[in-house]
């Protein structure tokens, strides 16, 4: 089946660059505002986003995406990729934007929490710019032709802290180590903290590798 990407447009920004990246790759993609009732034509799903965890979850909940992703998309076993904020929303809970200091429920597709980065060496937040990404020993189809230590483009202040270290497929370092790529491989759910669509040739390779993933 020819790849066709559903790109979730929940008003979280960063949509245009993802659409443009797949247009350049010649991959069919559709920017969808509300959850579709018929998903037969879609082979892959991308949840992009920038902004705060609380605002992101508010948007997904109000538009009906939260339940749809868990109840409709996830059971199909088709690949799902979160990018930047989209990766963070895959977590069980997060603290960004909480007025009470209590955690805010996330999609809970990958067990973990979103916490403020704590860089040492007087490094400022947000973490903006190119940084090296180091793959774990877990070999996955996502990392094909991507060497450990290659640079990707980041913009973030919060990071994904996995409950199970095996869900962290790659790390980077900004004064302290943090998760750069996470996954629950058994559910075909993937997340990248950096922006592959803004990471030039290697980012293009990652987006192609995602499209090559099959349903689990």
From Swiss-Prot:
GO biological process, one term: L-histidine biosynthetic process
CDD domains: GATase1_IGP_Synthase (cd01748)
Glutamine amidotransferase type-1 domain ranges (all copies): 4-216
Main location: cytoplasm
GO (cellular component) term, any one: cytoplasm
Assigned keywords, A-Z: Amino-acid biosynthesis, Cytoplasm, Glutamine amidotransferase, Histidine biosynthesis, Hydrolase, Lyase
Superkingdom to which the source organism belongs: Bacteria
Active site: 84, 195, 197
Function: IGPS catalyzes the conversion of PRFAR and glutamine to IGP, AICAR and glutamate. The HisH subunit provides the glutamine amidotransferase activity that produces the ammonia necessary to HisF for the synthesis of IGP and AICAR.
PANTHER family: IMIDAZOLE GLYCEROL PHOSPHATE SYNTHASE SUBUNIT HISH
HAMAP family for this protein: HisH
Name used for this protein in its record: Imidazole glycerol phosphate synthase subunit HisH 1
Lineage, broadest ranks: Bacteria, Bacillati, Cyanobacteriota, Cyanophyceae, Synechococcales
Gene label: hisH1
